[in-house]
Amino acid sequence: PILLPYHTDERLSFPRKSFSTLITLSRPLLDRMEIIEVSGYSVNEKLHIAKEHLVGKQLRKNGLATSLLKISDSALKHIILGYTKESGVRELERQIAKICRKAVTKLYEAGVFNADGTRNKEVKVCIRITDKNLTDYLGNIKYKTDKAYKKPQVGIVRGLAWTSVGGETLEIEVNAMPGSDDLRLTGNMGDVMKESAMIAYSYVRAITESGKYKVDMKYFDEHMLHLHIPEGAVPKDGPSAGVTMTTAMLSAVTGIPVRPDVAMTGEVTLRGRVLAIGGLKEKLLAAKLAGMKKVLVPEENVSDVEELDAEITDGLELVYVKDMSEVLNNALVL
C-alpha cells in the first residue's frame, strides 16, 4: 500500500500468511500451502524506497519539516550496509525513525521549538545527516561486510549462502595436518552440509589418487583435513557449498592457492558434477558487496540469471560451470 497508493485490496476467500523462513514450518503444513517466494531488495532498491517513502513518513510522524532535517544518500547507504541486516526495509525504517527522534531533541535544544511544541520561526536551523556524522545519531556500525583478500590464499575459499535476511559470503577454511582421522568438521553445520563435506572429501581423494594433481599416494593415510566455517554460533546447512568445500580441500592438499576475488556456489556430486542452487539473486548481491570480481555459477542456473535485472550482475564476471574441473580451472592459481 505504501508503494502502490492506488492499489485495490480485493479480499480473497482463503487466508494468506507471510513468513520470513520456511525452515520452522512443519512438512504437513507446507504440503497444504502454495508457496510464493518474494526476493529481497537490493541496496539500490532499499535506497530508493528510503528516499521516496520512509524518510518522508518518519519526518511527518515526528513533526519535522523537510527544511529541518536532511539525510544524504551516502548516509542512507551507510545505514543499509552498516546498521541493518535484512531482506526488507523494516529495520531500515527503525533506524531512520531513531535519527528523527534524536534530531527533534537537538532542534528543541537549539530553540527551534517552543515549550508548547510549536515552531519558533525566528530560529533557522537545519540538521544534515551524512556518513561523517551518522555515528552521532546511531552509534557505532553494527555489521561489517567481509571483503576479498588481497592475495591468493591456500585452503581458504569464499562461497555464497542464502539466509532469511538475504545473501551472505561464506568463508570456508581447510587445514591439512598429520593425523589418523579422515575429516574433521566444525562450524555448526547441519546434516546436509556435513554430507556435502563428505562428498567433497571423497571427490578430492579420488582425483588426487588418480594422479591428476601431484599428491603422494600415502598422503591421506598420514594426514587429516580439518574444515571449518567461521561464526560457529550461527547454524548452517544446505548443499550449495559443495563446490566451495571441494576447492578448499584440494587447495589445502596440493598447496595451490585460490584466487581471492573469486566466489562460488553449487552442489557437487561424487563424480564432480555441479548441480543447480537457489537464492541466486541474493548470493550475487552478497558477492558484489564483498568486492568479488568473478562468480562461478552452476550451468543449470543460466535461466535464473537471465531473469535478473542488469544492475545485479553489473560488475560481476559470471562463469557457468558444469563440473569441478571447470571450477578448479577458474579458481586455482595454476
PLM regions and their residue ranges:
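Conserved C-terminal "switch" segment of AAA+ ATPases
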Residues: 22-31, 39-97, 102-122, 207-218, ...
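Conserved catalytic-core segments of large NTP-driven translation/proteostasis enzymes
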Residues: 72-174, 180-186
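AAA+/SF3 P-loop NTPase mechanochemical coupling elements
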Residues: 2-21, 69-71, 221-223
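Peripheral, non-AAA+ core regions of ATP-driven protein-machinery
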Residues: 119, 125-126, 144-149, 153-158, ...
